[in-house]
Swiss-Prot record:
Membrane-side (Virion surface) residue stretches: 1-22
Protein name, entry field: Matrix protein 2
GO terms of biological process kind: protein complex oligomerization; symbiont genome entry into host cell via pore formation in plasma membrane; symbiont-mediated suppression of host autophagy
Parts of the chain on the Intravirion side: 44-97
InterPro entries: Flu_M2
Record-level GO cellular component terms: host cell plasma membrane; membrane; virion membrane
Main location: virion
Species whose genome carries this gene: Influenza A virus (strain A/Duck/Czechoslovakia/1956 H4N6)
Lipid group attachment sites (S-palmitoyl cysteine): C50
Activity control note: The M2 protein from most influenza A strains is inhibited by amantadine and rimantadine, resulting in viral uncoating incapacity. Emergence of amantadine-resistant variants is usually rapid.
Single Gene Ontology MF annotation: proton transmembrane transporter activity
Site note Essential for channel activity, possibly by being protonated during channel activation, and by forming the channel gate and the selective filter, residues: H37
Summary of subunit composition and partner proteins: Homotetramer; composed of two disulfide-linked dimers held together by non-covalent interactions. May interact with matrix protein 1.
Length: 97
């Protein structure tokens, strides 16, 4: 008998996993981690457009204005708006100092 047929032949107990009734904490922890990983993977595949769109736009909000006086905030907003207000078909070159 070849090795292949020996591997494919079911055992006396059938195709059961020998750890199915185990109460070993390591087996239980591995099972929980595996189930959580599967759930997270399924959610990621279902909602990946929404998740990554939120992350992408969340990172592009700009610098924090916490602790900056209101006059400086307004000046910054005005500069940003002026950089965006251009005719269609033209590019804006912003040089950083």
């Amino acid at each position: 008998m070849s090795l292949l047929t020996e591997v494919e032949t079911p055992t006396r107990n059938g195709w059961e996993c020998r750890y199915s009734g185990s109460s070993d904490p390591l087996v239980i922890a591995a099972s929980i981690i595996g189930i959580l990983h599967l759930i997270l993977w399924i959610l990621d595949r279902l909602f990946f457009k929404c998740i990554y769109r939120c992350l992408k736009h969340g990172l592009k909000r700009g610098p924090s204005t916490e602790g900056v006086p209101e006059s400086m905030r307004e000046e910054y907003r005005q500069e940003q708006q002026n950089a965006v207000d251009v005719d269609d078909g033209h590019f804006v070159n912003i040089e950083l100092e």
